[in-house]
A protein has these predicted regions:
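C-terminal helix-coil-helix/basic helical segment that borders enzyme active sites and/or dimer interfaces
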Residues: 13-23, 242-274, 282-296
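Glycine-rich flavin
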Residues: 19-126
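DPxDG-like acidic metal-binding loop motif
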Residues: 116-155
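Flexible, small-/acidic-enriched active-site or ligand-binding loops
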Residues: 149-176, 185-190
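A glycine-rich, basic-preceded beta-loop-alpha segment at the flavin cofactor/substrate interface
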Residues: 173-198, 212-226, 248-251
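Extended amphipathic alpha-helical segments enriched in small hydrophobics
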Residues: 203-257
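Generic structural signal for well-ordered, non-transmembrane alpha-helical segments
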Residues: 207, 234-241, 267, 271-278, ...
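Glycine-rich phosphate/cofactor-binding loops in nucleotide/flavin-utilizing enzymes
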Residues: 290-326
């Protein structure tokens, strides 16, 4: 890691011998637990948590996606005043992409669930998921579920980008399962911690950009750079510093700001960081060129992973919302 990028914390330590590009589910689960222990307790204050998430993103982008989901699940339990299953690896499966999601109703002590979950990250890897179930009256409840044996469809993931996040599709039809309800109906979307969670994701994006920058620095040493490449490196350094500053500023506001301002702060973080990350990716592609992207597996994987990951940010929707606030 270059001293030029020490505005961000260093990467965390991976388990010895961990294969970034060919790990199995068991190895990934162990790596999630290993990294989560370094991130620390879910109740940490935001400025401390953001530093850990920046370091996490700098470590490995697909793994960071999974660890961030685990940490988010533990924070949700903490906000609800409920307890997670001890030593379980968690995820949050709450995507409603293209009007998907699970409907559910109680039948005795069991829940009956139907529907489609897209982007179920960690499918086949994690032990438990926090999943919103939508009720007949339009409200929702958040359920803590054992998802370790749920079947999933991996054929729909057609890209190598983020493939090791194992974000697969799950289809359920009248699936009976035991579950623990987390919070009251409406808790998941209505809790004060919902929007701040997006700032945590932004910190992982910023850390992921630092990983890309580290790899680019190794691929194109200073003594071999053209003037144009040197300019691009300067732009990368500036955008990394900006992204880190945005994350840290928003983290401070999470601790001191009014609850009503949390959505604005989190949206500013996501929008500001995503813009920096996209520019870093553009500069990285320009510096590396076809040869660098074709021949350096670590670099090209990191670029592709981060491009897809930050692609979940809807820049136009967030800009429209921010522009409409007085």
């Amino acid at each position: 890691m270059s001293a030029a990028y020490d505005v961000l914390p260093p990467a965390l330590g991976l388990p010895p011998g961990f294969d970034r590009h060919g790990s199995c589910g068991v190895e990934q689960r162990a790596a999630i637990a290993h990294l989560a222990a370094q991130v620390g307790a879910p109740a940490r204050e935001w400025p401390v948590l953001v530093e850990s998430l920046l370091a996490l993103g700098r470590t490995d982008i697909p793994l960071a996606r999974l660890v961030e989901g685990h940490v988010d699940a533990l924070r949700i339990h903490d906000q609800a005043g409920t307890k997670p299953v001890q030593d379980a690896v968690y995820g949050v499966w709450a995507s409603r992409s293209r009007a998907t999601g699970l409907s559910g109703h109680q039948d005795g002590t069991a829940w009956v669930l139907s529907g489609t979950l897209k982007f179920a990250s960690g499918a086949g890897v994690i032990d438990r998921g926090l999943v919103p179930a939508w009720l007949a009256d339009g409200d929702h409840v958040l359920l803590d579920l054992d998802v370790s044996t749920w079947a999933f469809d991996e054929t729909r993931w057609r890209t190598r980008a983020m493939e090791l996040s194992r974000s697969h599709q799950i289809d359920l039809a009248d699936h009976r399962t035991e579950a623990t309800q987390v919070g009251e109906p409406g808790f998941y979307l209505g809790r004060p911690g919902f929007f701040p969670g997006g700032a945590g994701v932004a910190a992982v994006w910023a850390g992921g950009a630092a990983r890309v920058a580290d790899l680019l620095e190794s691929a194109v040493p200073a003594e071999h750079r053209s003037a144009g490449q040197t300019i691009r490196f300067g732009q990368v350094r500036t955008d990394l510093a900006t992204a880190a500053a945005v994350c840290r500023d928003v983290a401070r506001s999470m601790e001191t700001g009014r609850p009503a301002d949390l959505r604005t702060a989190a949206t500013l973080a996501r929008t500001g960081v995503a813009g920096c990350v996209r520019r870093i990716l553009t500069d990285t592609r320009a510096v590396a060129g076809p040869a660098g992207l074709a021949h350096d597996e670590d670099l090209t994987r990191a670029v592709d992973d981060l491009s897809l990951y930050v692609g979940q940010h809807n820049a136009d929707a967030d800009a429209e919302w921010l522009g409409g606030q007085s």
